[in-house]
């Protein structure tokens, strides 16, 4: 077992409880079960999609258009600090998990990337951000407030054109959030860039305990890459297109079976959790 898998096994381990305690646990879980049913409604999915796809985490929310990748995705890992072999494997597993969900290949490359993921030290984050993201106010805010960070640019058609992710391996591991950073930032640069406390259960909710994509996250990714939606759509156009996409996903079982399907080839399964 690798060091990271061993750490995860300890972090997420459970223990056997007497039957009485399980009954109490089930009662305590009943609100969560109701929430699980609630998130599968068209209304909840629509509003959740608007929260994460049509808003921006650090400003720039006016006249937002929907963005996603239309060109082939080429991901490069700059692995300058930490357990490089393990980190490379984590990125490979998570990127291919996302590729399977969105139905678009994500190639791991050494040149001409359009997504660059930088594994570095916290002390070097600002330097990397200045070189790869510029000195926009939103970048400075992310450096000040965030644990890890990502940004993206779009072309004139509002398609995703380039993205950069910076993860401070030392700091994120110390906080027990390394996997959270890899999972959330890679998922966000697929076209779901905003965090929201209104979206639950989800990795996009900073108050959630979820380190890995949930069934709700799976559906949001499926919506983002459904043919009914196109890069460049306005908010009103997205709202008009979502019922078509939701109907198709419901017919295919992608909503009712989301909690099971999100685990296929997932990082969570790779980690043995």
Feature annotation, model-predicted:
Residues 4-23:
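Bacterial N-terminal signal peptides that target proteins for export
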Residues 24-29:
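Charged, glycine-rich intrinsically disordered N-terminal tails and low-complexity linkers that flank
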Residues 30-35:
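N-terminal signal peptide c-region/cleavage motif recognized by signal peptidases
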Residues 36-72:
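N-terminal, post-cleavage mature segments of outer-membrane
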Residues 39-40, 53, 57-62, 136-176, ...:
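Metalloprotease/metallohydrolase-associated module, dominated by Zn2+-dependent proteases
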Residues 51-63, 77, 87-103:
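N-terminal post-signal-peptidase region of extra-cytosolic proteins
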Residues 67-82, 163:
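Acidic/histidine-rich, surface-exposed loop or edge segments in extracytoplasmic proteins
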Residues 87-183, 188-189, 193-199:
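Metzincin-family zinc-dependent endopeptidase catalytic domain
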